[in-house]
């Protein structure tokens, strides 16, 4: 099987320290043909991937699935690169389930970034969007025009811990906290041996080297959640607010989760924020986060403990936007605070009958049998309380 992947890493003009060194590394990477970031995977690629190995790799019992596999055969979606690895598994599982039921289906997902996904959804160019931030305000109002007679619903399909990944020779363990992270990403701390970092890492040999921050150059829900975390937990050290575009003022840009992970993997002295699954794939070192009570390493268990406290903004069936502010500020022992919920954004009404049936069928599969083995991909499967609410909302799509 051959998979064609378009790869690109975008670096903006120098916006902070270490720019020339970083760009020199990028030039060397381009000359050597290194892979720098996944931009898109075509629908035929996903279909081929599923038909080659879904039945053997997913181990799904189709008879136990509530997915009907009805409606149109091909769905299109775009958005969050953070959920790409999870979406690959959801699609593979769904194809496998429907194959066992005698149906041929496919979902083409382009990990173009959360902001782009929301834009394409509003324009009616895709059937649903993937986003690490809920659609809201003006965009939600515009979505009502697309969802004729309905509105856009944010449906959480998976939780993804955000890793603070770094490349620092000789430093296998690093502890940071929200205040120090805020100062690193706003330019207040520029050296790895800064006293504030040293105070959190007693006995560690920290080099007298510049810190190169790597940020998302595209509109990203991961960026939004990372900045919300800094805003909530840094005791006022972060004053740049939040949003899908990075507002901190310093950093070298790379496109997508794959882009920032690849950039840090090849740039000594660098640091970024990226989903755990991409940090794992690139074998990056990941910092522990000191929450005020203790330093907490990022594991599936520590992320799950934090996510267990997630709350919805509404008790109604339908939109399931989560309030993660309490998680960001947690000091519960053994709870990792830096997590995001990644959503599928759908129309509550307004689809034609074939699209509605297909969207509901795919989401039903993703919300249930699709959750199996997600931990192996660096995600946290849905807690039962979220899963129950999600299934009710999927059923309510008309």
Language-model features, listed with the residues they occupy:
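Extracellular/periplasmic juxtamembrane helices and adjacent flexible linkers that interface
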Residues: 29, 51-55, 67-70, 201-209, ...
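Bacterial lipoprotein signal-peptidase II cleavage site
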Residues: 46-60
């Amino acid at each position: 099987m051959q998979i064609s992947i378009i790869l690109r890493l975008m670096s903006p003009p120098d916006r902070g320290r270490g720019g020339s060194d970083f760009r020199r590394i990028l030039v060397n990477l381009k000359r050597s043909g290194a892979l720098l970031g996944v931009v898109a995977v075509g629908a035929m690629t996903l279909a081929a991937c599923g038909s080659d190995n879904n039945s053997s790799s997913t181990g799904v019992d189709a008879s136990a699935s509530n997915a009907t596999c009805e409606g149109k055969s091909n769905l299109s979606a775009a958005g969050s690169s953070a959920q790409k690895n999870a979406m690959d598994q959801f699609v593979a599982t769904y194809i496998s389930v429907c194959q066992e039921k005698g149906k041929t289906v496919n979902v083409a997902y382009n990990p173009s970034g959360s902001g782009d996904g929301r834009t394409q959804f509003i324009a009616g160019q895709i059937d649903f969007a993937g986003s690490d931030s809920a659609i809201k305000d003006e965009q939600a109002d515009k979505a009502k025009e697309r969802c004729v007679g309905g509105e856009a619903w944010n449906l959480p399909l998976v939780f993804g811990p955000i890793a603070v990944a770094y490349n620092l020779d000789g430093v296998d363990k690093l502890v940071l906290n929200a205040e120090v992270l805020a100062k690193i990403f706003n330019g207040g701390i520029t050296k790895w041996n800064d006293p504030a970092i040293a105070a959190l890492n007693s006995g560690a040999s920290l080099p007298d080297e510049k810190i190169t921050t790597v940020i998302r150059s595209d509109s990203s829900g991961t960026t939004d959640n990372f900045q919300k975390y800094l805003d909530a937990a840094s005791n006022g050290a972060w004053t740049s607010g939040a949003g899908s575009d990075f507002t901190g003022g310093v950093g070298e840009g790379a496109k997508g989760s794959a882009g920032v992970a690849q950039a840090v993997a090849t740039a000594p002295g660098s640091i970024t924020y990226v989903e755990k699954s991409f940090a794992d794939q690139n074998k990056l070192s990941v910092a522990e986060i000191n929450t005020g009570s203790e330093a907490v390493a990022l594991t599936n268990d520590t992320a799950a403990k934090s996510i267990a406290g997630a709350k919805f903004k509404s008790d109604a069936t339908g939109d399931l936007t989560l309030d993660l502010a309490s998680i960001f500020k947690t000091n519960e022992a053994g709870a990792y605070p830096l997590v995001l919920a990644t959503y599928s954004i759908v129309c509550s009404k307004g689809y034609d009958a074939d699209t509605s049936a297909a969207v509901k069928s795919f989401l039903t599969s993703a919300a249930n049998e699709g959750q199996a083995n997600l931990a192996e991909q660096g995600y946290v499967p849905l807690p039962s309380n979220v899963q129950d609410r999600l299934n009710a909302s999927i059923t309510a799509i008309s």
